[in-house]
Swiss-Prot record:
GO terms for molecular function: zinc ion binding. This is Protein SprT. The lineage of its organism: Bacteria, Pseudomonadati, Pseudomonadota, Gammaproteobacteria, Enterobacterales. Residues 20-163 form the SprT-like domain. Its cofactor is Zn(2+). The gene is sprT. PANTHER family: PROTEIN SPRT. Zn(2+) binds at residues 78, 82. Keywords: Cytoplasm, Metal-binding, Zinc. Binds 1 zinc ion.
Length: 165
C-alpha cells in the first residue's frame, strides 16, 4: 500500500502524535532532537520499525488503517522511543531499561514490547506442520527452508521435529 492510499487525516494524526511526543521528550530531556523521517513502508506483521542510522520510523499502513487509534497512541511513541534512546544513550538493548524509562517517564506511554492487533489481513499463506502435541503453521519462508534442507523446526512444547502434513 502506498502512502497516497492512506487517508490524509490519518497521516496528519500520526504527525501530530509524533511531534507532540518529540516536543515532550525534548522539553523533559533538555534537548532539541530533530524530527525523524517518517514513511509508511513497513510490511508483514510488524506494526513499525525504527531505523537508527537513517533516523527513520517506518509504519505498517495496513495495520495503521485497521487500528488507527491504538496504533497512533502506542506504536508511534514506541518507535520514537527507540530513536530517542539511541540519540540519548547510544546503542543499548532494544527494549531494555533505557527504552522502558523513555516510554514511561519521558513519553508517558505504557512500555509494551509487542502490539495486540489482529494480523489476519497482513499474514501471508502458511503451511501446516505437525508434532506429537499440536498443529503448527509455518510461514512461506520457513517452509521453503525446510524444503531446501536448510532448517529444521521443533515444537517449543514437546521438542519434536515439525513434519509437513
Amino acid at each position: 500500500m502506498k502512502t497516497s492510499r492512506l487517508p490524509i487525516a490519518i497521516q496528519q494524526a500520526v504527525m501530530r502524535r509524533l511531534r507532540e511526543k518529540l516536543a515532550q521528550a525534548n522539553l523533559k530531556l533538555g534537548r532539541n532532537y530533530p524530527e525523524p523521517k517518517l514513511s509508511y513502508t513497513q510490511r508483514g506483521t510488524s506494526a513499525g520499525t525504527a531505523w537508527l542510522e537513517s533516523y527513520e520510523i517506518r509504519l505498517n499502513p495496513v495495520l495503521l488503517l485497521e487500528n488507527s487509534e491504538a496504533f497512533i497512541e502506542e506504536v508511534v511513541p514506541h518507535e520514537l522511543a527507540h530513536l530517542l534512546v539511541w540519540k540519548h544513550f547510544g546503542r543499548v538493548a532494544p527494549h531494555g531499561k533505557e527504552w522502558k524509562w523513555m516510554m514511561e517517564s519521558v513519553l508517558g506511554v505504557p512500555a509494551r514490547r509487542t502490539h495486540q492487533f489482529e494480523l489476519q489481513s497482513v499474514r501471508r499463506n502458511t503451511f501446516p506442520y505437525r508434532c506429537k502435541c499440536q498443529e503448527h503453521q509455518l510461514t512461506v519462508r520457513r517452509h521453503n527452508r525446510v524444503v531446501r534442507g536448510e532448517a529444521v523446526y521443533r515444537c517449543v512444547h514437546c521438542g519434536e521435529q515439525l513434519v509437513a502434513k
